[in-house]
């Protein structure tokens, strides 16, 4: 990675490349936002476990994030894209209302479609642990579900497409923890073994900022898992 790597607050990574004379370069900037805290449960106590939308705490997290975005001198998005899943959609609509942006929803930015909610968490993990490590990327929990390898390919394709579509623009993408983690694989070119040793954190309502200069074939991780807006005392 190019640039002078320095310690940054809140456990973030900061890359500060030297700017050319005449001002900052033409950049494509992607801000990956994880949705606020949500509630998972069964409708009327029956059926599969589903996303019931943002919790009260989640709405407060998004309100704090909205206030930060409105006050930020550096984050100036012109496009707001969201996963179609309820927790992300609700987050994006709150952000869009605060920032004056219309929301475009796309299924490509959804979380890993590992199962349909009918597998209980303990049973899911038991099945996962029973699969040989070399086979996990290709394991399908249910006939209609997405393998991990398919998920990683979807993430890469979605990020490539949006960066081409909005080249030179500043884009907010409201998505999920798994998607944000998989984005590190895409941008850094990590292989399957990378996340067996460590993985990046992606807290609720966090910001992870990637940028690319015009003419460069490399992306720069400006910062990740930035939640400074959640650390102030009191309600947003």
Locate predicted features.
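Short beta-strand scaffold positions
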Residues: 82-83, 153, 174-175
């Amino acid at each position: 990675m190019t640039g002078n790597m320095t310690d940054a607050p809140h456990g973030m990574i900061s890359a500060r490349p030297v700017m050319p004379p005449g001002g900052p370069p033409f950049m494509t900037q992607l801000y990956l936002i994880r949705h606020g805290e949500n509630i998972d449960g069964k409708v009327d106590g029956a059926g599969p476990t589903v996303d019931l939308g943002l919790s009260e705490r989640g709405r407060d997290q998004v309100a704090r994030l909205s206030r930060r975005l409105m006050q930020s001198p550096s984050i100036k998005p012109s496009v707001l894209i969201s996963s179609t899943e309820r927790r992300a959609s609700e987050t994006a609509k709150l952000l869009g209302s605060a920032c004056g942006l219309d929301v475009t929803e796309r299924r490509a930015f959804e979380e890993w479609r590992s199962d349909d909610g009918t597998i209980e968490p303990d049973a899911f993990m038991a099945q996962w642990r029973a699969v040989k490590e070399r086979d996990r990327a290709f394991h399908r929990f249910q006939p209609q579900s997405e393998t991990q390898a398919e998920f990683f390919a979807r993430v890469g394709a979605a990020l490539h497409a949006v960066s081409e579509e909005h080249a030179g623009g500043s884009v907010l993408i409201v998505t999920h923890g798994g998607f944000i983690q998989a984005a590190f694989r895409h941008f850094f070119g990590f292989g399957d073994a990378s996340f067996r040793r460590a993985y990046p954190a992606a807290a609720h309502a966090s910001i992870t900022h990637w940028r690319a200069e015009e003419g460069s074939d490399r992306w720069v991780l400006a910062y990740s898992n930035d939640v400074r807006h959640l650390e102030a005392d009191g309600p947003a």
